[in-house]
Design a protein with these regions (language model features):
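Catalytic-site microenvironment of enzymes
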Residues: 3-4, 8-324
Length: 324
């Protein structure tokens, strides 16, 4: 109900020409409707913008979380390369465009477990734990990153290498833990393998080695190391880069053997969250330094190592994970 404003108006009636005439006061009540003005302020709702959809889908995160390279977009979805190198159709997923960093958790699946520590710790699981922690750290720093595998499934070396090229990455780091155990050492036996013809790979390798060595040296452990441990090229007897994750990608790449899972004291350390946090943070520092500075790192070994590693998992033993 509107409020009423009551105004008392006093009328004075006077007799003409008679100053002493009686004055009659007539009270009059006038009712005036008051006007209430209401101002409506529009409500503004702030929401986060949806993720940017790349103009070209270079890779895809499938509904099951597997990252695959995209061969082409189709009317019904995507044609992709599976982790085992097969072609498959996927109806939906999260498209990925150009990505700054690709992290490769070495090994994976039932057959390719990698080395196993005396405490039962499997290299494939440890590599993934470190890689996922590194991914989370890089995301916090505003750096785009994707993993070549996101769970315990097999993935062929050529497919992993191709993913880095497919997303036009600035760099790739393949994460590993070493075996067999060499002789005792006063410091960690971190080894970083680099591309023999790439100065960028050499610079990245030096940054990775320096940061990881500094982080691991804070732990009181009976370390083991090879005599030539450091940043080095590893060549096959044919004279080529020996490791598939080094020779395969066009992308600037390094393979980091962080320390020796085959050494029991080191394996006990690797089973702790403190280790995973320390080494992933060190790797993130190295990546950020590579992308934002001209720093060159340290630990370079002049003479290449000659070695013929075992080939990666073949197509006959590779079992693809579910994509949808």
């Amino acid at each position: 109900m509107r409020p009423l404003l009551v105004v008392i108006v006093v009328l004075i009636v006077a007799c003409s020409g008679n100053a002493g005439a009686d004055v009659t006061t007539i009270p009059t009540t006038t009712t005036i409707a008051a006007t209430t003005t209401t101002t409506t302020i529009p409500t503004t709702t702030t929401t986060e913008p949806p993720p940017a959809v790349p103009e070209v889908a270079r890779a895809l995160v499938t509904p099951t979380g597997v990252v695959v390279s995209v061969l082409e977009e189709t009317a019904t979805g995507f044609r992709v390369t599976t982790p085992c190198g097969n072609e498959a159709a996927v109806r939906e997923g999260t498209p990925l465009g150009t990505t700054q960093v690709v992290i490769d958790p070495g090994h994976g699946g039932e057959v390719d477990t990698g080395a196993v520590g005396a405490n039962g710790l499997m290299e494939k699981h440890l590599n993934l734990d470190v890689s996922q922690a590194l991914q989370a750290d890089l995301i916090v720093r505003g750096i785009d990153v994707v993993l070549t595998r996101t769970a315990d499934y097999a993935s062929r070396l050529g497919v992993r290498a191709d993913l880095a090229d497919q997303v036009n990455a600035d760099l790739l780091i393949s994460v590993h833990h070493n075996a067999p155990t060499p002789g005792p050492s006063a410091r960690p036996g971190t080894e970083v393998f680099i591309q023999s013809t790439s100065e960028d790979s050499r610079r990245l390798g030096g940054l990775v080695w320096g940061r990881v060595m500094a982080a691991l040296s804070d732990f009181d452990v009976e370390w083991t190391a090879a005599p030539d441990a450091g940043v080095l090229t590893v060549l096959s007897t044919r004279g080529n880069d020996a490791y598939g994750m080094i020779s395969g990608p066009r992308t600037t790449s390094v393979l980091a053997e962080l320390a020796y899972i085959s050494n029991p004291p080191e394996a006990e350390l690797f089973a702790t969250s403190e280790y995973v946090e320390a080494v992933s943070d060190a790797l993130a520092d190295a990546v950020e330094n590579y992308l934002t500075t001209e720093a060159t790192g340290a630990g370079y070994v002049a003479e290449p190592r000659v070695f013929n590693p075992q080939p990666g998992i073949g197509s006959s033993l590779c079992v693809d994970p579910a994509l949808e």
